[in-house]
């Protein structure tokens, strides 16, 4: 997971990407965290757990960009789900590499 201090500077290192920005509301409710992420990624609203999120995120191979950048706006010290979402992204990336796609997961404490 990448820590972003300056969004524009960070994004300038990529040429062919699709950006998803997630305002993380819940730092302690897993279902709410997953629901927020699913909503931003345009995934079905019935996704309630990590396995379901993995299954649905595999559909991101359809995104017309090589890099799928997800920036989570949250406090990394307080968000207990960052290691879980990192594992989810790692698993999904194994699938996406067959389609020349990759998810880049980043975290930022503020929208700059």
Question: Where on the chain are the PLM-derived regions?
Answer:
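P-loop NTPase catalytic core of nucleic-acid-dependent motor ATPases
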Residues: 50-59
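N-terminal intrinsically disordered, low-complexity segments enriched in P/E/S/T
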Residues: 1-45, 60-112
